[in-house]
């Protein structure tokens, strides 16, 4: 139901009265925090936050995340409407415009990573990522999807369009495969925990052996429709596996996947020196995908094998939206 207040706020936006809208956002959020707590307050004020993040000049929009309004007024990294407010902002302005304005470190980092996903090269002039995640997409990160599919496409008055990336996307190019006996599960692998954190709606296992043995641990049948893909074509769905609710953005997925790849490669650097090791891992990795007949609308069935260390990780999950 559209209320008088909605019409009033829309009229203020149409007139470019953004300071008044920011004040309304802050007052509404602070009052809701006092009345009901942080989470309900964030949900209540998110539509107005989306409007400001999408349409206001960047000098004002970044103030959604500033603490100068007082307790309860600040949008956090989890505040979202159709998607995180910081991601809405990041899709609207270049890093050159936003870098001098953004202060909070968590928001700043996620906005920078979003701009990287959208094709910006921040490897010169931007502060290094605290975990050493590169500020320029590797060729294998960019190859498997169009720029428009990497981040939600937000709409001015709320809502967003997003690509639903799944593995396998179809049966095309796959064939009948008889999986071998499943390998023995290995526990305590940091890479396994990192992959589980990436896709917390899926099951993750690690085995010593090739990718099909890892797949056999989670596949519902020893006879599957499956095949191999280059990692560049697997990468987009792995990034999007982390974006399962509106409070998370594609930057979360890229950061989580890089953590997993660093662990799989056995790299230890946090200053970007591990990129060569990750690139080498990606070049040698064998990725086996398989189809499950009961797959939900969102599904991920892939096994990632590193032949250099003889380990393989399977990630398998399915859910309806």
Where is each model-derived feature located?
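Long, positively charged binding patches that form subdomain-scale interaction surfaces
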Residues: 170-294
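Generic detector of well-ordered alpha-helical segments enriched in charged/polar residues
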Residues: 10, 19-23, 45, 49, ...
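Short, solvent-exposed aromatic-acidic interface loops
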Residues: 317-321
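Short acidic-glycine loop/turn motifs at beta-strand connectors
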Residues: 306-309
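Internal, hydrophobic cores of structured domains that mediate oligomerization or house catalytic pockets
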Residues: 66-190, 315
């Amino acid at each position: 139901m559209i209320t008088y207040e909605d019409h009033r706020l829309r009229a203020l936006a149409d007139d470019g009265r953004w300071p008044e809208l920011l004040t309304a956002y802050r007052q509404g959020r602070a009052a809701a925090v006092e009345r009901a707590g942080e989470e309900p307050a964030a949900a209540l004020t998110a539509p107005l936050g989306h409007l400001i993040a999408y349409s206001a000049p960047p000098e004002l929009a970044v103030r959604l995340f500033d603490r100068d309004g007082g307790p309860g007024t600040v949008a956090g990294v989890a505040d979202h409407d159709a998607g995180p407010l910081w991601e809405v902002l990041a899709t609207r302005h270049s890093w050159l415009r936003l870098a001098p304005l953004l202060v909070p470190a968590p928001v700043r980092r996620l906005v920078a990573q979003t701009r990287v996903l959208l094709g910006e090269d921040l490897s010169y002039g931007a502060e290094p990522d605290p975990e050493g995640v590169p500020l320029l997409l590797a060729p294998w990160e960019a190859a498997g999807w169009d720029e428009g599919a990497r981040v939600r496409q937000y709409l001015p008055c709320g809502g967003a369009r997003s690509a639903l990336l799944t593995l396998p996307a179809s049966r095309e190019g796959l064939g009948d495969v008889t999986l071998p006996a499943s390998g023995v599960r290995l526990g305590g692998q940091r890479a396994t925990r990192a992959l589980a954190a990436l896709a917390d709606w899926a099951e993750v296992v690690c085995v010593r052996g090739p990718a099909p043995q890892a797949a056999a641990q989670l596949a519902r049948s020893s006879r599957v429709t499956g095949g191999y893909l280059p990692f560049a074509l697997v990468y987009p769905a792995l990034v999007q596996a982390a974006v399962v609710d509106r409070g998370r953005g594609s930057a979360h997925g890229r950061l989580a996947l890089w953590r997993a790849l660093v662990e799989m490669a056995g790299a230890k650097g946090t200053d970007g020196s591990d990129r060569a090791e990750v690139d080498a891992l990606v070049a040698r990795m064998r990725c086996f995908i398989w189809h499950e007949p009961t797959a939900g609308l969102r599904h991920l069935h892939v096994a990632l094998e590193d032949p250099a260390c003889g380990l393989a990780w399977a990630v398998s999950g399915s859910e309806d939206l």
